[in-house]
């Protein structure tokens, strides 16, 4: 199903970003792209859950813990990107 596909893509993007330690700006940008795609996957999963609630008239509270977990994941990825700004500054020679 769609949520399963998106979750698989999310996992792949996080793993790809995590397996790359940037030593050049190109690698930094590639890692950033994976991180951004992971955030997009999270947003897509949230949208699919919302669609399920609307179409099947499911109690929205049924998915509350999943929504919270996905929101937490988005926050963690965003913090990760912020920490990577130090790598970017180093690669640009601004350290």
Please describe what each predicted stretch is.
Residues 1-95:
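Amphipathic alpha-helical assembly/interaction segments
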């Amino acid at each position: 199903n769609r949520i399963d596909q998106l979750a698989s893509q999310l996992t792949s993007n996080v793993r790809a970003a995590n397996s790359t330690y940037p030593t050049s700006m190109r690698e930094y940008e590639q890692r950033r792209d994976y991180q951004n795609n992971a955030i997009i996957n999270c947003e897509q999963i949230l949208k699919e859950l919302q669609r399920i609630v609307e179409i099947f008239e499911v109690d929205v509270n049924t998915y509350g813990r999943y929504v919270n977990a996905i929101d937490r994941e988005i926050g963690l990825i965003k913090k990760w990107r912020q920490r990577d700004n130090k790598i970017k500054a180093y690669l640009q020679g601004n350290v």
